[in-house]
């Protein structure tokens, strides 16, 4: 809300002095599929619907993090390694087709412990939230995958995909963590969560 108020203030000043205005803004936020940003987007639309009002935005602003991955139909799998300066990693997967999540937690850097969870298992779990607790290399991890419909495309299901631990200050740095989506019949996008 503070961003939008700042934009309005700047545009009001530009209107007052009779000048067009371009605001350059570095967002730094993750993707939203649950509707949290709908009202904010409506405010931005109303501010930029006036001729001479332009907002240029840079999303992400965290070049060191993996922000997006796409596995198209026909490709069996796609994946990446994940880490964070916190004790958890959080991504959002989105697809209209069923697929399999593979989360691998490595003992050190070479011995993976893979956990496979299907999207159907998540949807069938109580509250569409699937939990797995496991120990790898003496460290306790919790895998949580929760499902909900995309507010923008109701035929697509979004999955909050989280791995957390209290045993690592910076998850994925001593024991590597990889995310993989599998299933040749599914088109899956994965976004970094906030």
Identify the residue ranges that each predicted region occupies:
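Loop-rich non-cytosolic ectodomains and luminal regions
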Residues: 1-194
């Amino acid at each position: 809300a503070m961003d939008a108020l700042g934009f309005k203030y700047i545009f009001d000043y530009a209107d007052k002095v009779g000048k067009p205005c371009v605001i350059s803004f570095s967002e730094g936020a993750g993707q939203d599929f649950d509707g949290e940003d709908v009202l904010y987007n409506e405010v931005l639309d109303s501010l930029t619907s006036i001729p001479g009002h332009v907002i240029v935005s840079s999303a992400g602003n965290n070049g060191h993090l993996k922000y997006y991955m796409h596995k198209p139909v026909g490709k069996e799998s796609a994946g990446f390694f994940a880490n964070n300066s916190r004790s958890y990693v959080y991504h959002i997967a989105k697809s209209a087709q069923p697929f399999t999540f593979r989360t691998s937690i490595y003992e050190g850097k070479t011995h993976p412990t893979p956990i496979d969870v299907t999207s159907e298992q998540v949807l069938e779990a109580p509250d569409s939230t699937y939990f797995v607790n496991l120990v790898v290399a003496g460290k306790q991890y919790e895998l949580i995958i929760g499902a909900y419909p995309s507010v923008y495309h109701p035929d697509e299901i979004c999955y909050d995909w989280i791995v957390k631990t209290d045993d690592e200050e910076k998850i994925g740095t001593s024991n590597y963590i990889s995310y993989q989506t599998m299933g040749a019949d599914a088109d899956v996008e994965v976004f970094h969560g906030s």
